[in-house]
Regions:
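Flexible, glycine/small-residue-enriched loop-and-beta-strand segment within the central core
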Residues: 39-42, 48-49, 68-80, 84-149, ...
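Glycine-rich phosphate-binding "P-loop"
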Residues: 64
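Beta-rich strand-turn-strand
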Residues: 140-164
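A short, terminal or domain-edge coil/loop segment
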Residues: 16-21, 116-127, 154, 169
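Residues that flank catalytic or metal-binding motifs in active/ligand-binding sites
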Residues: 107, 158, 168
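Acidic, glycine-centered active-site loop in nucleotide-sugar glycosyltransferases
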Residues: 168, 173-176
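Terminal amphipathic alpha-helical/low-complexity segments used for targeting or macromolecular assembly
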Residues: 1-61, 135, 153, 175-186
């Protein structure tokens, strides 16, 4: 097994890989987001940022987190100034997710840091980090797979599946995502 894959050891594929105290903290997080944030209007963004910071999210400047965004494990999320996590976007942060300055994750996009080791009979959980570069744009319903780095100023088209890194200034789309152009910046 590749040590870079960061497997979380499970005794059984039918049990959580997380210790009981992490499960309690995750339950508190889900309850808090539902009660204190999910219903809030757009201008309550500073309140949502505060709640995320209380649960360990690393947020700098003024990122925007939509009230209907889903964040699995907030202490694995880093967002920089002007980064945006859109409506119903899903940061499935079993591993680290880093969204740099000015990057946009559009509605219903899915950043997935977790998968399973299909060569292991117990299907061990494997996590790999995701990084979205400065001023990158992830289109609606796009899926970014574990371990992917989206380069600065890159664009991922709507409903694309991205299984590998996207270099700076590239435009990709499709399943699997393929280069369809270059993005120029002024």
């Amino acid at each position: 097994m590749n040590p870079k894959l960061n497997p979380k050891r499970q005794k059984s594929p039918y049990q959580s890989p997380w210790p009981w105290w992490t499960q309690v903290l995750l339950s508190c997080w889900r309850f808090s987001w539902l009660v204190f944030c999910r219903w809030t209007p757009k201008f309550f963004n500073p309140w949502r940022i505060l709640v995320l910071k209380v649960f360990g999210a690393n947020l700098s400047g003024m990122p925007f987190i939509h009230s209907k965004a889903r964040i699995q494990i907030p202490w694995n999320l880093t967002m920089k100034h002007r980064a945006c996590l859109g409506e119903c976007a899903n940061a499935y942060s079993l591993g680290k997710i880093k969204i740099l300055e000015g990057a946009t994750i559009a509605q219903e996009a899915y950043l997935c840091t977790g998968t399973h080791d299909f060569n292991d009979p117990s299907l061990q959980l494997i996590t790999k980090p995701i990084m979205v570069g400065k001023n990158a744009f992830i289109g609606a319903r796009a899926m970014i797979l574990p371990g992917v780095c989206i380069g600065d100023h890159s664009i991922v088209g709507a409903m694309s599946v991205v299984p590998k890194d996207v270099p700076n200034h590239q435009i990709v789309a499709g399943n699997p995502a393929q280069k369809i152009g270059e993005r120029t910046t002024s």
